[in-house]
C-alpha cells in the first residue's frame, strides 16, 4: 500500500494537461493501485493522476469507497453528453469546499481499462458527475472553474481561513 501526496489548490501543477498513456504496463498498474490506496485513505470517490502529480491520463473511481466497484479509465474521452444535473461537488485537492456545479446527467465515455483494452460505457447521475469531474482534472480544470468569479473569490477567502487550521503540509497555500 502506497499513499501518494495529494496536490492542493492553488498548486499550479493541478493546471497541467496530462499526457495520454502510450502503453499500459506494470508501472501503470502500480500507479493505479497507489491511486486507489490514496483515494480510499483520503475517503474520496474519484481521483485523477494529475492530483497526485502524475501527469498521465489515468482516473480511478469507486463510488462506494470500499473496494466494491473499482473503475479505471485510461485516456478517457467523453463522446456524448445529455441532460443537466446540479449537485454539490467537492474535491480532494480543494478540501472542505462544496459547491453546486451543473454537469451533464448522462454521458458516454470511451477509454482503456487497466489491461489496455478499449471499452465504452454509459454513466448517469453521480457516476457521470464523478467521471466529468475527474476528466476535467486531466485537462487542468477544477470544479471551481465552473463557478462565477464572485463564488471563486468567496472560495479563495474560505480557503485562506481554512488553511490556518491545517498544518502547512496538509493544505498548503
Curated annotation (Swiss-Prot):
Active site, per annotation: 134
Coiled coil: none
Record's cofactor remark: Binds 1 Fe(2+) ion.
Cofactor requirements of the protein: Fe(2+)
Superkingdom field: Bacteria
A family per Pfam: Pep_deformylase
GO process annotations (BP): co-translational protein modification; translation
Binding, Fe cation: 91, 133, 137
Molecular function GO labels: metal ion binding; peptide deformylase activity
Enzyme class: hydrolase
Keywords (A to Z) from UniProt: Hydrolase, Iron, Metal-binding, Protein biosynthesis
Its job: Removes the formyl group from the N-terminal Met of newly synthesized proteins. Requires at least a dipeptide for an efficient rate of reaction. N-terminal L-methionine is a prerequisite for activity but the enzyme has broad specificity at other positions.
Family: Belongs to the polypeptide deformylase family.
Identification of the protein by name: Peptide deformylase
Organism listed in the record: Blochmanniella pennsylvanica (strain BPEN)
